[in-house]
Regions:
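Metal-cofactor-binding active-site regions of metalloenzymes
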Residues: 1-185, 194-199, 205, 209-210, ...
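Active-site glycine-centered loops adjacent to acidic/histidine catalytic or metal-binding residues
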Residues: 190
């Protein structure tokens, strides 16, 4: 099968991070300068998740206002349409973009407006997964998820937990997701990406219906647990 044939196949993208999916052209336009590929991607010598996550800092500078978030949503669906993606679930962390000029509701709405315009122009269906971040406080994360619930079924489909897993184990977030269940918000959790496999078990016990970026699911008893609980297999 050729590259062109692969491009023509219809695709579904279930694990896409907004700030990791912006085109180089979009980043350069927003920053008003040339950007090298090295600024946007890790080298083969990358040794940790923390080092990897630093590459999200530059794209994040493009998402500081409503125009940037609108444009980012539009840009992502534009580039996905070129790969014949027909449906995408796009993750982003609203609290990264909150400022004196934009509250959480405005942040989410700005992205959804851009995605909706992209859907109309390029025919790509979408949903948004709002990410709580491990280094944010429980209060901050809960308030973000509560606000995102206003958009549930109107562009937002779920919440997530992402960030430096080794520094913030899953045990610190059990109460957050107990409260998230009470809000009626479905959720997926990044777990087992680094740190120990117990984070996967804890994420499932917390109520996650999906586990993302989970290398440790190759362990036999973890696989059995995933099968018994009917968890959607991890997106690597």
């Amino acid at each position: 099968m050729t590259v062109n044939e692969l491009r023509q196949l219809p695709k579904i993208e279930l694990h896409c991070h907004l700030d990791g999916s912006l085109s180089k052209e979009f980043v350069e336009t927003r920053l008003q300068r040339a950007v090298s590929c090295e600024e946007l991607s890790v080298s083969d010598e990358c040794t940790s998740l923390v080092e990897y996550l630093k590459k999200f800092d530059l794209p994040g500078q493009c998402l500081t206002d409503e125009e940037g978030l609108f444009g980012a949503g539009y840009d992502v669906l534009r580039t996905m349409s070129q790969e014949n993606v027909c449906y995408a679930e796009i993750r982003f962390a609203p609290l990264f973009h909150v400022s004196e000029q934009m509250n959480t509701e405005q942040v989410i709405e700005s992205l959804l407006n851009g995605l909706e315009k992209g859907k109309k122009d390029f025919g790509v269906e979408y949903n948004v997964i709002t990410c709580a971040m491990r280094h944010h406080s429980a209060k901050q994360n809960y308030q973000m998820i509560k606000t995102a619930c206003q958009f549930l079924g109107r562009g937002v489909c779920a919440a997530d937990l992402a960030g430096a897993e080794a520094q913030y184990p899953m045990t610190e977030f059990m109460e957050l997701f107990e409260q998230t269940k009470k809000l009626g918000m479905p959720f997926t959790i990044h777990a087992g990406e680094c740190g120990n496999a117990q984070n996967i078990v804890d994420a499932i016990e917390a109520g996650a219906k999906r586990i993302g970026q989970s290398c440790h699911t190759r362990i036999k008893h973890i696989l059995h647990l995933i099968e018994r609980r009917h968890i959607l297999r991890p997106q690597i």
